């Protein structure tokens, strides 16, 4: 019930020391609930590396979920959508008027912009134009550098990790089990964006929904973290050489993209694992991107004191940071 974290000791070249971390017993139970509604939602352009945002909204504007909040000054086709409907209440700026955050007072009943469905006959150019226009392109990342994918180029292959090996992270077999249609729709269009394959890793003994998905190259992986990292899959299957690039999409973002393709609506939802030693009732919650963290943890933390630290990331990433 322990995990080993490794780091390089600068005084002993390439020798590893082990920090044992006890995490057993703190995992989320396989119970899914809707997250309590957050009053406010925020979108922070700094979450997207290399983007110089230009606002498409102003304070007091009423918006729909899926309306474009901002775009990249250096590429106006690269757009970023609102996860919720509501009213723009605040635009927080930093030095030199840099946009730090766009704050939205959410409607009690969410209203979605309908951008129309993407036809199954769509070609590569149609797909790129659609994903850019509806604000879904930023879900596609490029390696090296982990930046938003360059839609003007073509990756040699695309990668998805369907297995999260990081302790206390969400079990993707559980979170994705009811989204076969959305995942299939997303994977089918991603296939048209590369001359290579859409490569997906799953845990060897799992009952993953990806076993039912067509148009993918499936890899069974096993072993401790980071076996489930998409970088581990890339390194084993199709390493990135000089001058090459591959694209990656997170498994839960496939659901958002697929829903947009099938319904024309931007439903920016993710199922998150609420877990840890201070959580009274560890469980899974369906939350909307940009929600306030206290809306998720509200009334579910015991022994609240200065020793608690709430992280919107995995256990390993918390130690690395």
Regions found by a protein language model. Name each.
Residues 78, 92-321:
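Buried, small/hydrophobic-residue-enriched core segments of structured protein domains
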Residues 77-85:
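Short coil-to-beta-strand transition motifs
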Residues 1-56, 71, 105, 218-221:
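N-terminal, Lys/Arg-enriched amphipathic/low-complexity engagement segments
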Residues 51, 82, 98:
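Exposed loop/turn and edge beta-strand positions of beta-sandwich/beta-sheet ligand-binding modules
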Residues 57-71, 90:
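Short, well-structured beta-strand-loop connectors
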């Amino acid at each position: 019930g322990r995990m080993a974290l490794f780091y390089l000791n600068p005084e002993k070249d390439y020798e590893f020391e082990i920090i044992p971390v006890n995490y057993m017993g703190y995992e989320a139970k396989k119970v899914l609930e809707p997250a309590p509604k957050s009053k406010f939602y925020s979108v922070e352009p700094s979450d997207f590396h290399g983007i110089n945002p230009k606002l498409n909204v102003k304070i007091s504007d009423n918006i729909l979920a899926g309306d474009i909040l901002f775009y990249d000054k250096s590429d106006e086709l690269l757009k970023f959508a609102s996860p919720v409907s509501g009213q723009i209440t605040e635009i927080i700026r930093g030095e030199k008027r840099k946009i730090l955050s766009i704050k939205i007072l959410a409607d009690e009943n969410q209203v979605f912009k309908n951008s129309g469905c993407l036809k199954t006959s769509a070609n590569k150019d149609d797909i790129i134009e659609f994903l850019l226009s509806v604000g879904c392109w930023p879900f596609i990342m490029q390696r090296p550098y982990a930046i938003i994918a360059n839609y003007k180029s073509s990756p040699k292959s695309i990668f998805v990790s369907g297995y999260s090996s990081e302790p206390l992270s969400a079990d993707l077999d559980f979170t994705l089990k009811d989204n076969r249609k959305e995942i299939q729709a997303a994977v089918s269009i991603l296939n048209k964006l590369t001359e290579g394959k859409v490569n997906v890793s799953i845990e060897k003994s799992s009952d993953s929904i990806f076993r039912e998905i067509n148009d993918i190259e499936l890899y069974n992986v096993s072993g401790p973290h980071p076996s489930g990292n998409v970088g581990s899959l890339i390194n084993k299957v199709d390493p990135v050489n000089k001058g090459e690039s591959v694209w990656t999409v997170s498994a839960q973002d496939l659901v958002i993209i697929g829903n947009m393709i099938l319904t024309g609506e931007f439903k920016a939802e993710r199922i998150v694992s609420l877990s840890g030693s201070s959580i009274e009732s560890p469980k899974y919650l369906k939350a909307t991107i940009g929600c306030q963290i206290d809306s998720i943890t509200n009334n579910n933390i015991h022994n609240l004191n200065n020793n608690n630290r709430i992280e919107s990331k995995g256990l390993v990433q918390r130690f690395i940071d």
